[in-house]
Amino acid sequence: PGADAGLGVLAKLKIESSYSFGYLKFEGLSFVDAKDPARNKMFIEDFFINSSFFNDQLVIRAGYQIFNWSDLEVFHPADVVNSIDYDSDLESLDKKGELTLSMEYPILSGELTLFLWPKVEKSIYPSENSRLGLGTEIADPNWVIDNQVISKQWNNQFGILVNQSIFKGDYKFHYIKHIDRK
């Protein structure tokens, strides 16, 4: 008790490839801690196929994706789509990929993107022995939808994103109906 010691190995695997039917991307993360097996984890960050149709006018992407709603990769109030690994680097928490179906179509001087998220990934919380933990095991998350507490991961959620370049500025407008992972 009171000692904070750890010995861990973090590995990331990234594979990207183009095919006649589209673009495939896989990115996964694995962490093994020799002193605290409760911290061992493996999860998908990105694993999707990206295909274009109608002379590249319609882009459909399906699979697990990480979203960064901020172009600068800094804190952003709307950056709530992905579940988080709270037992990772505090300055840049790892995100878990979310199962996604998206369709992107060009409009005016930008794009309109529709998102469907059928499943909520569970965030990873620090173990009771972690330096970031509370000294007790944190239970699996529950979510509140329409004033009802639920624990099922399969819940339909959606989002709309409009990107536009107007004059010399880039603008993003979005609407998200989802379960907040934070």
Predicted features by range, described:
Residues 2-5, 119-122, 157, 161, ...:
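Outer-membrane beta-barrel biogenesis signature
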Residues 3-5, 16, 37, 87-91, ...:
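Outer-membrane beta-barrel proteins
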Residues 4-10, 39-42, 92-96, 151-155:
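Transmembrane beta-barrel outer-membrane domains
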Residues 10, 104, 115, 163, ...:
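Residues in well-ordered beta-strands of folded domains
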Residues 11-17:
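Histidine-anchored nucleotide/phosphate-binding helix
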Residues 12, 98-100, 157-159:
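Short hydrophobic/aromatic beta-strand or adjacent loop that forms the aromatic wall/cage
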Residues 17-132, 167:
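Outer membrane beta-barrel
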Residues 133-182:
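Surface-exposed beta-loop-beta
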